[in-house]
Amino acid sequence: KDDEWWKGRRVWLGLDLSLSEDNVCVDMKTYEGDDKDNAVLYTKTMGFIPAGKIAQKSKREGVDYNTLIRNGCCIACGDEVIDYTKVEEYVLTLEEKLGVEIVQIGYDRWNAISSIQKFENAGYECVEIKQHSSVLHSPTKWLKECILSGRYWYEENLMLEINFQNARCTEDTNKNKYVNKKKSVEKVDQVVGNINSTYLIEQELLYGGDGFVAQVG
């Protein structure tokens, strides 16, 4: 999808801000359909990496980050650590650049507080998503179902594809599946961002956007 396709659409953002020296993800997602069984997900994922660690990360992870940057899959910012002002600027200018309406921003509290305060001050509704299997199991399962049934469309993005290849799921004692960062091979931040935005859309479809967000655990 080109940028023009997004104009006028309501979108939900899923963030994975993680550690400042690690990769960061901003995933933007919308959908078409009336319920979970027929909804089609559309996503645009952007990564951020420390500019001063491109060579080091490329060698260690076996990923050509310079090519990913040239292809528009990620943005290099800062030096040894991520410059979060660039991430915040990206989020805060999405509506103007693409003509979208940001409905909600979903995030993991880890390392996100400062950025989230800026987003809330700008008038955006931000939803903390507990990174626990009891919460993430359902959107993870639904995202997988959408992918396997051809109801997940994404802008061409090799970085996103690499992240999905890296991802490994684990089951908790209740058989709830979730993406386990510790057991995954290399980076999965873009998968986590996708799951967070999928969670918000799942809540929208289940509860009609009445502001009720269910998190158990």
Please name every model-derived segment:
Residues C146-I162:
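A polyampholytic, Gly/Pro-enriched intrinsically disordered region
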